[in-house]
Amino acid sequence: MNCSIGNWKHTVLYLTLIVSLLYFIESLISHKLHINYNKIRLKRSPNLPLRFRDDGTFKILQVADMHFGMGMITRCRDVLDSEFEYCSDLNTTRFLRRMIESERPDLIAFTGDNIFGSSTTDAAESLLEAIGPAIEYGIPWAAVLGNHDHESTLNRLELMTFLSLMDFSVSQINPLVEDETKGDTMRLIDGFGNYRVRVYGAPGSVLANSTVFDLFFFDSGDREIVQGKRTYGWIKESQLRWLQDTSIQGHSQRIHVNPPALAFFHIPILEVRELWYTPFIGQFQEGVACSIVQSGVLQTFVSMGNVKAAFMGHDHVNDFCGTLKGVWFCYGGGFGYHAYGRPNWHRRARVIEAKLGKGRDTWEGIKLIKTWKRLDDEYLSKIDEQVLWETSDSFLK
């Protein structure tokens, strides 16, 4: 009898301990198990369609190679000894805010290596912090991937999915194709982050509801093996087919030519190396790191006729523009402080501005595209302003 009572007491004691332990564990993690309805919200979308301003201008800020890590604890690279102690990712954030306040862009184009994957333990958190100033100011933005973004906790598909769902983003995972039986489906295409952004004419103008400016974004890949050799990625044939198909779709019948277009991607094409032997504007300070494959990008741009310039990153201490067969290829210049650079060479950003032509009583299509850079110095110095394209033609039938 005494033995039975002892066993019963032990059982009650064990059960009490187990219940207490479970209650303790639940108290520690309950905030993670319950939905906080106050934090559930929809993506804040930009005002679409994007369009030119009342003054007939549209301005794009290109941000190349932020290489963002984990904020304050991620130190700068290649800065002066006197700057190093207090230099971190926050310097990159501060520079982005300065550029936004100075230029007031209509769109920000993040052209890859937005985060430096190996320097963060949480890719999503790093992206939120890196892109944060664009969201704070409510500015529409678009992003493509570089060759370092995916080296952390998210793969390339997951990264583009996340980027497309962030506030004020116009980024897309890949282009959609209309299917009468299935609805919109994603086109089978190489990479993640191939998409088109249309810009409409100025409010109240005859082209207010028409595409007058096309912006094409591409995934230029990561690393690949070609004939046993390791090389960088490149824009593939499927992407170029999509570009050609898309560029002829959906333009207003009021415009007698395809609107001018720009392209944005991370890794330069092979032909950019040839610019060393030509006049260029800016600085050509390092070799062009690109694929050994001649991708057909230049030939496609030339055959289309309306792609006026392409903007890229990847080689941080190159910031030049040069022209190949009538198409400009421009580096953004290294933006981020955790990216490699040169101690006496200021981080920088590129600005692109398009201006509409003025008819007798209305804004017409684009008349001029120009670009310049700003340095992250005391004065946010403006350098290397140049015209990329200009026309005297009328755009209307």
Swiss-Prot record:
Reported cofactor(s): Fe cation; Zn(2+)
Phylogenetic lineage: Eukaryota, Viridiplantae, Streptophyta, Embryophyta, Tracheophyta
Gene name, Swiss-Prot/TrEMBL: PAP28
Protein name, UniProt field: Probable inactive purple acid phosphatase 28
Annotated keywords: Glycoprotein, Iron, Metal-binding, Secreted, Signal, Zinc
Residues holding Zn(2+): 266, 314
SUPFAM superfamilies: Metallo-dependent phosphatases
Residues at which Fe cation binds: 316
Binding locations of substrate: 314-316
Tissue: Expressed in roots, stems, leaves, flowers and siliques.
Glycosylation sites (chain numbering): 91, 209
Gene Ontology cellular-component annotations: extracellular region
